[in-house]
Amino acid sequence: MKRTFAEAMAHRRSYYSIGSDSPVLDEEIVHIIREAVKNVPSAFNSQSTRIVLLLGDEHKKLWNIVKETLKARISAEAFAKTEAKIDGCFASGHGTVLYFEDTSVVKKLQETFPSYKDNFPTWSQHTSAMHQFAIWTMLELSLI
């Protein structure tokens, strides 16, 4: 029996011990992300959220870049712990979802509606948070 959205929300958790096998087909992940981008509301219908889904080699490449960058910036002792965390909790996964806010959209709204200009950056972050919440909850729903 399928969970309701409320049940999926209550059950949703961060998973840290992850593997490269996904219980959700890649096509379903793409569909979930597209539905969120299309349907999650945003202030002034700004639709400023941008999402990148990395799978396969692109996912691995990202986490190698992260490790190389951190290795150059932190001590060897700290890096060993960090590398273990990255390898066991992030790079070992099936894919990565990256969330961005298009600042050109925010700037355009600030110019168009100067009375609200100080609010648009915050509203943009609210929109990003709603996208993240919607996507992770829909992914939780699809696990059943």
Identify the function of each model-found stretch.
Residues 15-16, 99, 116:
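Sequence-level detector for tyrosine residue identity
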Residues 93-102, 106:
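Conserved active-site beta-strand-loop modules that form the wall/rim of enzyme catalytic pockets
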Residues 74, 104-105, 109:
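Membrane-helix exit/interface motif
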Residues 63-65, 107-112:
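Short, conserved acidic/polar surface loops in the N-terminal third of protein domains
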Residues 37, 103, 113-144:
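Small-aliphatic-rich amphipathic alpha-helix that forms the alpha element of a beta-alpha
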Residues 1-95:
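N-terminal amphipathic, basic helical "cap/leader" segment at the start of enzyme domains
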